[in-house]
UniProtKB/Swiss-Prot annotation:
It holds the Pfam family CutC. SUPFAM superfamilies: CutC-like (SSF110395). GO terms for cellular component: cell junction; cytoplasm; cytosol; nucleus; striated muscle dense body. Disruption phenotype: Reduced copper tolerance, which results in reduced brood size and retarded body length, protruding vulva (pvl) phenotype. Disulfide bonds: none annotated. Involved in copper homeostasis. Affects body morphology and length, egg laying and brood size. GO terms for biological process: copper ion homeostasis; egg-laying behavior; IRE1-mediated unfolded protein response; multicellular organism growth; multicellular organismal reproductive process; response to copper ion; vulval development. It comes from Caenorhabditis elegans. This is Copper homeostasis protein cutC homolog. Belongs to the CutC family.
Length: 250
């Protein structure tokens, strides 16, 4: 007997970019980790060493690795795509079980060639189309193309600054393509709003950082960059637990 839509378990993906965050996310009950570096830049490709350690420490937790060479737009040239595909190959060997990627053309449509290259390189692992869809010119066509080229999921805030603002488009994505692709509602998701997001979007996956500020140790007066003046952010064990507790009875 198959599950009905209302009976499906609602799951939580936590994005992390450091080992402390990974430990807290797993201890809090995260169903999956989106593994990145530099979340303050929207998430970039993680190192092979980082993924290797996570795979060793948490063999039962799915690890979906961000593939994004640089910050900025999602229009990649040939050399950048070669580097992206090389990263996929090495991260597969390190223990990645899935990938997160998105590429657009300069006109704002899904770059089929680049996306197909990543999907083929990632096989047999699934690939999620990330929030590039939120800056696509036409999200409906972009989502149809994502399904057509073989993405298994899409991460979105509904083309708004937060998932809470984008609930109507997220709900429409879910209704239009139910059963064809998993829609992950993400950006600004927390324990105080996730119940409303479940009610309004009907998604079965939610994506959050569940992070809190952590003051950096003042080792010296020499700055390594602008981010030195900002507190780092670490996934909160309690916030992950509260998210899971809120999702469990829904």
């Amino acid at each position: 007997m198959t599950e009905t839509e209302s009976q499906k378990q609602i799951k939580l993906e936590i994005c992390i970019d450091n080992l402390e965050s990974a430990e807290n996310a797993v201890a809090g009950g995260a169903d999956r980790l989106e593994v990145c570096s530099a979340l303050q830049l929207g998430g970039l490709t993680p190192s092979v060493g980082f993924v290797s350690i996570l795979s060793y420490k948490y063999p039962d937790i799915p690890l979906y690795c961000m593939i994004r060479q640089r910050a900025g737009d999602f229009v990649y040239n040939e050399d950048e795509m070669a580097a992206n595909m090389e990263d996929v190959e090495w991260l597969k060997k390190a223990g990645a079980t899935g990938f997160v990627f998105g590429a657009l053309t300069s006109a704002g449509s899904l770059d089929r060639t680049s996306c197909q290259s990543i999907i083929e390189t990632a096989r047999p692992h699934p690939v999620t189309f990330h929030r590039a869809i939120d800056v696509a010119y036409d999200w409906k066509t972009c989502l149809e193309d994502a399904i057509d080229v073989g993405f298994k999921a899409v991460l979105t805030s509904g083309q708004e600054p937060s998932a809470l603002d984008g609930v109507y488009i997220i709900r429409e994505m879910q209704e239009l393509h139910k059963g064809k692709i998993d829609v992950l509602a993400g950006c600004g998701v927390n324990s105080s709003n996730v119940a409303n997001l479940v009610e309004w979007t009907k998604c079965h996956w939610y994506h959050a950082s569940a992070s809190v500020a952590k003051k950096n140790a003042p080792l010296n007066k020499v700055s390594m960059g602008k981010q030195d003046n900002q507190p780092s952010r670490v996934t909160s064990l309690e916030e992950v637990r509260m998210l899971k507790a809120t999702l469990a009875p829904v």
